[in-house]
Amino acid sequence: MSKRRKHSWPQPLKGAESRLWYGGDYNPDQWPEEVWDDDIRLMKKAGVNLVSVGIFSWAKIEPEEGKYDFDWLDRAIDKLGKAGIAVDLASATASPPMWLTQAHPEVLWKDERGDTVWPGAREHWRPTSPVFREYALNLCRRMAEHYKGNPYVVAWHVSNEYGCHNRFDYSDDAMRAFQKWCKKRYKTIDAVNEAWGTAFWAQHMNDFSEIIPPRYIGDGNFMNPGKLLDYKRFSSDALKELYIAERDVLESITPGLPLTTNFMVSAGGSMLDYDDWGAEVDFVSNDHYFTPGEAHFDEVAYAASLMDGISRKEPWFQMEHSTSAVNWRPINYRAEPGSVVRDSLAQVAMGADAICYFQWRQSKAGAEKWHSSMVPHAGEDSQIFRDVCELGADLGRLSDEGLMGTKTVKSKVAVVFDYESQWATEYTANPTQQVDHWTEPLDWFRALADNGITADVVPVRSDWDSYEIAVLPCVYLLSEETSRRVREFVANGGKLFVTYYTGLSDENDHIWLGGYPGSIRDVVGVRVEEFAPMGNDMPGALDHLDLDNGTVAHDFADVITSTADTSTVLASYKAERWTGMNEVPAIVANGYGDGRTVYVGCRLGRQGLAKSLPAMLGSMGLSDLAGDGRVLRVERADAAAANHFEFVFNRTHEPVTVDVEGEAIAASLAHVDDGRATIDPTGVVVLRR
């Protein structure tokens, strides 16, 4: 991971005060110019002060090779700027025009079978194509030269959602780039052979030229897991290398103008190593779309907290989310009433100083015409636009009250997330396909919240070991360095929760031998010899295990065969004799150095974890940490605590009444009176303390 760039935030227009940014993607080229003035009128009404422009406008800006038309974009930016609306200007390189792909079909990426992915949607370019790079960098150069010194442009939006559709390319360009990547990482082909375990299945290589991408190998076969893991690393790096090239061209011509690109961080997405990418942007930005159903709010808060972790608690930018339904799910559920304000304020609570949507005006044609927007098809007279205006007013009040300059207050608890562990657990020849990394951190975040504890979600490379309490949930890969950090954290007094599927392999997906969890067995005080996966695909096979604490394990359990003398069993299995699991330990507490650990050797899910947490916390001497799980409380404060804010969200589907402190400065579906707040479902109250 490279050294992090110094954080730099888009500055207000000349003469304007620093405020929370608010707006969305704006596509004036998709509408007649007579609509633009009405757009600006509605933006002013809603409190919009920034829009992202030109993201998919390459074909409009360069309609023919070498011929540029900036006139329409100049007029749009000028109108916006004179109305006090700043512009986050795109490099416009996200989707190449047809003339380019017709002239150079070699820029199109290939799938694992070698088939060309043709134009017709977006992101049909291959990241490693030198031809595409030449054209993209030329456009960046033209954009930067034309808009250098423009008073209304406050940031660069480089490309868009790198890897959303072209994450994996299997072309010969990609093959050559992968060979170079391996040579840089491993230096010798023998080191590659060792890392990939090529002695298995006669895969030994004599030269870097023998390395090929993980192309199609036939149905029902298994790709080398080390190679597959490295290809995911390479693919993230290849896209990052292109981003850096675009960024550097823009920066060389417009120094001092902050640059970003929009990530896709959620509880269900790990396209790229966004923690690694976070080091290469001036400010971190994210596109997040809510998960319909009972996890909606918790997942929003979880993903926002992870963004705060990726940003290392510097202000970050919510670049895209939706006012209601998206267009790309089999069933595109509408958002619950009130969630426009609630979800956005959850992101603000977790450190976002900018709230933007896709998109400003809902399209009347194209693939995303059914994707909700700030101005829906129904127009100004609609509940969505009224909610958009309410949110704008709330963000304005928070700015007036001094929220800018505050950061999310550090929790006592860190839930650790690791992109590479997710990539490794996606492999199809693992002990079970019912378990991977990314589901467990969200379960822990929600279970902690059920016990009134708001955790920080942080990347494994971050300072998780500076917290009082840390959770390693299915962190499958533990390198020697991370294992050392674990050992030192607990020995020095840290409190650590570790789950099944943690520490099984090193960074090359080589198993830590001697019993699981490999490199930290002594820290957690257990030794696992075998696993007991569970499912319902085979009649009569083990499909669940009851615990004697009243919870139930599904999908996966460790067969813990021995525990340390320093350990205490907090829960065991109650199972029929034939299973071999009766009275086998399931949850084990241990002392190590000056610290304490709890090992959870099975998948309990959110509800099982929530029920087990009081006893687990008690074993660590942390019983007083729990609070009211009906609400999620998040605080923001500045370094001197002169400005201190508390956000209180209703997590339930019923009204809740709770004690609060301070002056209510924003409330949605909530009422505050004499230190008591009544908050309806999807409601939130913000207090200045």
Swiss-Prot record:
Substrate binds at residues 122, 160, 328, 368-371. The keyword Iron does not apply. One of its GO terms (biological process) is galactose metabolic process. The keyword Cell wall biogenesis/degradation does not apply. This is Beta-galactosidase BbgII. SUPFAM superfamilies: (Trans)glycosidases, Class I glutamine amidotransferase-like. It comes from Bifidobacterium bifidum (strain DSM 20082 / JCM 1254 / BCRC 11844 / KCTC 3440 / E319f (Variant a)). Keywords: Glycosidase, Hydrolase. One of its GO terms (molecular function) is beta-galactosidase activity. Its EC number is 3.2.1.23. One of its GO terms (cellular component) is beta-galactosidase complex. Coiled coil: none annotated. Pfam families: Glyco_hydro_42, Glyco_hydro_42C, Glyco_hydro_42M. Belongs to the glycosyl hydrolase 42 family. The active site is at residues 161, 320. It catalyses: Hydrolysis of terminal non-reducing beta-D-galactose residues in beta-D-galactosides. It is an enzyme of class 3 (hydrolase). PANTHER family: BETA-GALACTOSIDASE GANA.
